[in-house]
Amino acid sequence: MIITVDTGGTKTLVASFDEEKNPKHIIKFPTPKNVDQYIQRVANQIHLITNDKPIDAISVALPGVVKDGVAVWCQNLGWKNQPIGELLSRYFPHTPIFIANDANMAGLASMLRLPKPPRCGLYITLGTGVGTSLILNGNLHKELSDCEGGHMSLNYNGKITTWEEIAAGRVFQRIFGELSSDTPLEVWEEVANRIKAGLQPLIAFTQPDIVVIGGSVGVFTSYFSDILSGLLAENLPAAISVPKIISSPNPEEIVLYGCYDNAISQLTSN
């Protein structure tokens, strides 16, 4: 049994995966900002899901920079240099525990579930924050694993800010309320414009074959993708093609799939 944990800036999902590689027994709860409370809550939910049956691995995703099981920097949780892997291992001392960045896990899972992994795939998650990952030929390269596109500085409407401060899902919710199929066109136009502000330089720099959008906003990609593509076509140099823009499969659970993929990869390579 493989246990996966998607730690978000707002909520955390814990799930086990069955032999068909699908998540089951998904439990959702608000992410505690206190690290000790977070570890205790995750451990309790894992025990509840597994009923103390053997666990092959625990694979955890965190919303920030991760190094050797340590949450080096998770801005939306206020965590800095927190040894998440070590703390969790106190509850599961005989179980392999893998810790990784959430956008990396979601990006890897998204690209691997396309009919053919692209040469260069750019993944963006729009939720509590903005996360990015770059997947090359279906592989996540260690040298690119610390990409934090959401924190790049932008000049937006005459103000220096970060992409995350204008295009995170929480920002859209604060400004427009809950996005839905009934959201008016003018809102989707503004959503697309804000996403474009950060996506345009990333496309110019990486020139991906495809852009996959996940997170809470990714659910609605089909409502703004054409608008976004049009804005990019207007503003990118003619020599740079506008990549296809799609929603991640299972955008609100794709991190769990990535955690599963990472666990399988780690277990089979050791």
Predicted features along the sequence, with ranges:
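Short beta-strand segments
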Residues: 6, 59-63, 100, 122-129, ...
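Anion-binding (especially nucleotide phosphate/pyrophosphate-binding) glycine-rich loop
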Residues: 80-91, 95, 103
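Catalytic metal-binding/acid-base residues of hydrolase active sites
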Residues: 104, 129, 218
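A cytosolic small-molecule/anion-sensing beta-strand core signal
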Residues: 136-137
